[in-house]
Structures are given as structure tokens and as C-alpha cells.
């Protein structure tokens, strides 16, 4: 009977933890949907295979929501095997988040190189109509930038020979005309001077530490849930033996 107060305390803590865990799943799900709707154009320029990133967040968030509810149910039910299954799932989530966080931090320079390569390729194949061209236009308009390093990068693009610099580079598109955009000297007074690569990579460098810290913080929080679930399972089993 001595284990009952401990079980009550552990149940309360684990229910609170499972609810917070469930909330993180909802947040991941929301971020995934938001990323798909809002950041799809940026993601498509980081790497061709990275367009699945929002779907990964949506899938991960949905899974966490389901297991967060399962954790609450297992805790209220007081089932040792359910609690062990919950702890096992938390350990898998911990390992997956840890690997993802380390990989993202270690390979951040490769991500920057990939962005440089894919953005340069997108400029060379730019036609103003396809998805990657629209992505380039969206980046240049939203970040008020032009080209990779600066606006002169467009002079090597086949599109420039026929149409000049894309209007998305203009500081004021109503003040730009095709003749101005064909002439690099005149265009210098009409288009944004900053390159898109520097703006994107400086944002990554500035926020990488914060992102990594949050990722590791969330990952290690799974250890708390694992510990609570395992302890509660053990105390419930011990209490059953005491009753016998």
C-alpha cells in the first residue's frame, strides 16, 4: 500500500507530460501545414528532395498527437505493458530527433552549398513560368534581393539575352521597363543590389544555434517521459504484488 501515493504522483506528472507532448505534436503538425503552404517555394530551392520536409513534419506531428493521447490513456488505465510501449515510443522519438538535430547542425554547410547550386541552376533554366522560376521570383520579391551574389549574375542566364533581368528584381516594378532591364548599367539604379544567397545564408547562420538548441531541448525532454513511464510501470507492478 506504500506505493499508492507514489503512483498517484507519477500518474499526475505523466499525464501533464503527455499533454505537453501532445501539444508539441499539434505544433509540429501546424508548422508542417504552414511550411507547405507558405515556405514551399523556399524549400524547393534548397534541394529537390527537400520538398518532402513539410510532409515529414505533418507525419511526425500526427504520430506524436496519436501517441500523446495513447500516453494519457495508458497512464489513466494504469497498464504496465501500455506504459512500457509508450516509453519505447518516446525512446524512438528521442533517437530520431537527436539524429536529425545533429545531422542538420553538422551538414549545415552542405545545405548552404546545395542552396547555392540549386539557386544558380534555377537561374540558368529560368523562364518566368515554371514552378522553380516562380520560386525564384517569390524569393527575390519577398527578400528584396536579386541574383545569387548580386544582380549581375543574371547576365549569364539565357533568359537575360532575350528578356533582361526579371522584373521580380525591381525595387519598384512599375518603374522598370524591358529596356532598362536589358542594360546592366541602367538596371543598377532600378533593381535590388543585394544577392539572395547572402540573405538566406546569413539568416541560417543567425538562427541555426537557436534552432539546434530548441531541437535538442525537445529531444531530451523525451527522456523525462521515458523515466516517468518506466517508473510508473514498475511501481504499478510492485503495487500489484503488494496486494497479492
UniProtKB/Swiss-Prot annotation:
Q: Which InterPro entries match?
A: Tetraspanin/Peripherin, Tetraspanin_animals, Tetraspanin_CS, Tetraspanin_EC2_sf, TSN6/7_LEL
Q: What is this protein called?
A: Tetraspanin-7
Per the UniProt annotation, where are the glycans attached?
Answer: 49, 150, 153, 172, 183
Superkingdom classification of source: Eukaryota
Record bears the keyword Membrane: yes
Which stretches of this protein does UniProt put in the Cytoplasmic compartment?
1-11, 71-81, 230-244
Which family does the similarity line name? Belongs to the tetraspanin (TM4SF) family.
Q: Which residues lie on this side of the membrane: Extracellular?
A: 36-51, 108-208
Record membrane topology: Multi-pass membrane protein
Q: What UniProt keywords are attached to this protein's entry?
A: Glycoprotein, Membrane, Transmembrane, Transmembrane helix
Please give the chief subcellular localization of this protein. membrane
Q: Sorted alphabetically, which PANTHER family does this protein's record hold?
A: TETRASPANIN, TETRASPANIN-7
Q: Spell out the CDD domains in the cross-references.
A: TM4SF2_6_like_LEL
Which cell locations does it reside in? Membrane
Q: Which ranges does the record mark as transmembrane?
A: 12-35, 52-70, 82-107, 209-229
Enumerate the Gene3D superfamilies for this protein.
Tetraspanin (1.10.1450.10)
**GO CC, one annotated term:** plasma membrane
Q: What does this protein do?
A: May be involved in cell proliferation and cell motility.
Species of origin reads Pan troglodytes
Amino acid at each position: 500500500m506504500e506505493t499508492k501515493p507514489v503512483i498517484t504522483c507519477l500518474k499526475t506528472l505523466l499525464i501533464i507530460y503527455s499533454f505537453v507532448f501532445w501539444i508539441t505534436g499539434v505544433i509540429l503538425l501546424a508548422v508542417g501545414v504552414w511550411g507547405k503552404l507558405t515556405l514551399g517555394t523556399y524549400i524547393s530551392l534548397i534541394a529537390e528532395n527537400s520538398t518532402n520536409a513539410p510532409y515529414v513534419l505533418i507525419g511526425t506531428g500526427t504520430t506524436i498527437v496519436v501517441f500523446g493521447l495513447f500516453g494519457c490513456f495508458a497512464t489513466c488505465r494504469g497498464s504496465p505493458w501500455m506504459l512500457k510501449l509508450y516509453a519505447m515510443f518516446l525512446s524512438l522519438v528521442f533517437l530520431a530527433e537527436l539524429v536529425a538535430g545533429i545531422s542538420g547542425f553538422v551538414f549545415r554547410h552542405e545545405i548552404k552549398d546545395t542552396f547555392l547550386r540549386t539557386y544558380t541552376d534555377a537561374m540558368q533554366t529560368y523562364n518566368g513560368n515554371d514552378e522553380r522560376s516562380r520560386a525564384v521570383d517569390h524569393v527575390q520579391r519577398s527578400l528584396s534581393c536579386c541574383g545569387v551574389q548580386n544582380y549581375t549574375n543574371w547576365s549569364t542566364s539565357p533568359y537575360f539575352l532575350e528578356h533582361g533581368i526579371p522584373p521580380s528584381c525591381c525595387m519598384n516594378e512599375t518603374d522598370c521597363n524591358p529596356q532598362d532591364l536589358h542594360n546592366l548599367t541602367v538596371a543598377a539604379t532600378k533593381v535590388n543590389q543585394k544577392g539572395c544567397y547572402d540573405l538566406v545564408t546569413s539568416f541560417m547562420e543567425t538562427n541555426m544555434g537557436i534552432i539546434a538548441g530548441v531541437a535538442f531541448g525537445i529531444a531530451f525532454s523525451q527522456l523525462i517521459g521515458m523515466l516517468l513511464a518506466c517508473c510508473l510501470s514498475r511501481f504499478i507492478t510492485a503495487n500489484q504484488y503488494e496486494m497479492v
